[in-house]
Amino acid sequence: MEDRVNEAIEERKSGNTVESIRILKELIDEYPESGSLHYQCAWSHDASGLEEEAVEYYEKALTYGLDEEESIGAYTGLGSTYRALGKYEKSKEVLEDGLKRHRDRGLSVFYSMTLYNLGETKKAMELLLGQLCDTSSDESIQSYAAAINYYSRDLDRTW
């Protein structure tokens, strides 16, 4: 099975998502409760621009169980897919659930985008600015990190 999964991943990486999906669906027929196969199939659907179809596979992947790395990817993928489909509340719900389970910066950034779409711009900016301060090695950002973090908590405040 591992060789076939690797083949499907390589097909996806080379842009042949149709073949990747075909291989993964065959494997899912053999191993219908494999969270990892459902996750890979969801990813290949997403890479094909088939977001609606990806949702079912992401949901099954999370239901059947994944290792930590794949779980983070599935929460990110599903939350991002819901956002791309305009299902912002569902996106928020999925990403919040993912963030309860995993401390992951990528999840947090996608969550910020969803908050923006929901009009929760203050919270979105606070999260993004915090990520910027925490991850940037740029000296000019780091020299102002304390101020950026302080101001990010209430961007509308004036003195």
Question: Model-derived features: where do they sit?
Answer:
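TPR/TPR-like (Sel1-like) alpha-helical repeat modules
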Residues: 61-63, 103, 116-139, 149
